């Protein structure tokens, strides 16, 4: 997703709500975003001893990348900002080959390496879930693409990654991002883009072309994974309602219908055209009438959770649970 997702309030609320229903298998993807010079969700903190620098030419599964110049130690701390247990007893480190080895002081612990195309995923597991761990990285200079925090118990993993300013068009030159999705082995891919595509000078034919190129890159490594589009929230452009959002929504829905994808029309759930103004009145939208406040994003995340559960229950009532 874009900045609506990077702030963490929408996906954090959806994640915690879904995990209360399906079980908690962990926080999922995290990244030292502040070390990369950008904002980070509130439910975790990662600090570094040094030896990391931003890689501006690569964009991995978390939307950003860091070069390792020595053997850094990361202090990873999680909290219950979204009223969910974010303790973990497994960390996976996703990096470029030859890759990074990972170790923690917890004992006993075990390490497993997975090699996927041009990447290495090194996982460390220990017994008791914790909320604070010092992770030591070693190996030849590599690119760090992501970290994954898990609990070794049944439940749901809801990974999220947002990139400020991202649109379908900005990610077409990000092969690492698309390649690394396979490491997660997802059961569902949720795409939350479109706001930035509809800003500036919008051309529907160009957007349609970018959308198709984006999906070709995604489908190359994930040909059969179900895809769900969350359509952009209502917003303004140049001081008035962004009328291009309707054109973009139609193009996305037409694509979804023709390619067996699902979609969720957030702007409709919010109240339709011009609803961003009403959300601003309730202190749920920012002054720019483009972004939303934490309160607004958290409500959107909860509405998304409700839509997922409603569809899940409807499906379960009409199908054999074994299917």
Where are these regions (language model features)?
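Catalytic His-Asp segment of secreted/periplasmic serine-dependent ester chemistry enzymes
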Residues: 235-323
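Conserved SGNH/GDSL esterase-like catalytic core that processes O-acyl groups on lipids
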Residues: 6-107, 113-209, 244, 291
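Conserved beta-strand termini and adjacent loop/short-helix elements that scaffold enzyme active sites
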Residues: 32, 161, 230, 266-269
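Solvent-exposed, polar/charged alpha-helical surfaces in well-ordered, non-transmembrane soluble domains
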Residues: 8, 12, 16, 175, ...
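Extended, alpha-helix-rich binding/interface surfaces that flank or overlap catalytic cores
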Residues: 2
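Active-site segments of SGNH/GDSL-like serine hydrolases
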Residues: 190-196, 216-250, 265
